[in-house]
Structure formats: structure tokens, C-alpha cells
């Protein structure tokens, strides 16, 4: 159980009040600033950071994003701020193309009152579009 493992690690660390996170916080702030730069970029075709920011703006905190595989998954993994646990679905280990749409469909079945969006490319969509009557 991860909670137990984290608890044991924390117990083993002892006093951490002397730790200095100044440099780490500066790196985080620089990263946040870089992400914010692209959030309102109006270039065409759409800038990936803009797409991620727009989806974050319109999707409520309990909304679910199901990602297929493609370079956009990296943009979401780096730039999308999940406000609640289990609201970003991605298959990181095997990079399974075509998983985004069925993941979104399953999420909607499990959480019918929450908005769900699938982000997938043409190939991933075509692999499963018949499952939802889209084909």
C-alpha cells in the first residue's frame, strides 16, 4: 500500500524543518511561468499549451480527461493541472494507441454526472470510433 510506504519513509526521515526548498520553488515558479506563456497563444494551428489551458479553463475540477497516445499526451502530462485525483486518465506504461476513447466511455459509465473529454488523434479515434456509433 503506497500510503503505508510513504508513512514509513516519512517516519524514517525524522526532522525535516531544516530542509531548504528555495531552489526547488524557484524552478517550479519558472516552470509555471513558461506554461502560462503559451496559455493565451493565438497562433494557428493551435499551440498545444493553448489547447491544454483552454480545456483546463472549461472543464470543472471533477471533470475527467482521457488521453490517447500521441505527442499531445506529453503536453497534457506536463501542463494540465488536475484539481482532483483520478481525473486524468492516461496509459503511460505501454503507450497504447486507441485507449483514449474507450477510457472516456468507461469513465462516463462510472461517473455519469461528471463531464468527460477524450483527447485523441485521428488514428486513435479511428481504431475505436465504431464502439460509440461514431463510424
Regions found by a protein language model. Name each.
Residues 5-6, 73-75, 97, 125-127:
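Flexible loop/turn segments at secondary-structure boundaries
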Residues 1-25:
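Glycine-rich, acidic loop regions that bind phosphate or pyrophosphate groups
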Residues 110-135:
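Conserved thiamine diphosphate
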Residues 13, 82-83, 135:
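Short secondary-structure boundary/capping segments
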Residues 18-22, 66, 115-118:
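Acidic/polar loop patches that form or flank catalytic/metal-binding clefts of enzymes
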Residues 26-113:
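Active-site diphosphate/adenylate-binding microenvironment
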Residues 10, 101, 105, 117-119, ...:
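Hydrophobic, well-ordered secondary-structure segments
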Amino acid at each position: 500500500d503506497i500510503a503505508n510506504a510513504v508513512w514509513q519513509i516519512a517516519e524514517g526521515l525524522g526532522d525535516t524543518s531544516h530542509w531548504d526548498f528555495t531552489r526547488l520553488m524557484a524552478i517550479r515558479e519558472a516552470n509555471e511561468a513558461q506554461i502560462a506563456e503559451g496559455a493565451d497563444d493565438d497562433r494557428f494551428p493551435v499551440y498545444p499549451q493553448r489547447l491544454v489551458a483552454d480545456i483546463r479553463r472549461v472543464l470543472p475540477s471533477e471533470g475527467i480527461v482521457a488521453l490517447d497516445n500521441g505527442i499531445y499526451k506529453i503536453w497534457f502530462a506536463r501542463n494540465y493541472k488536475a484539481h482532483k485525483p483520478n481525473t486524468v486518465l492516461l496509459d503511460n506504461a505501454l503507450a497504447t494507441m486507441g485507449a483514449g476513447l474507450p477510457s472516456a466511455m468507461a469513465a462516463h459509465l462510472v461517473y455519469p454526472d461528471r463531464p468527460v473529454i477524450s483527447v485523441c488523434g485521428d488514428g486513435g479515434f479511428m481504431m475505436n470510433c465504431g464502439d460509440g456509433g461514431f463510424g
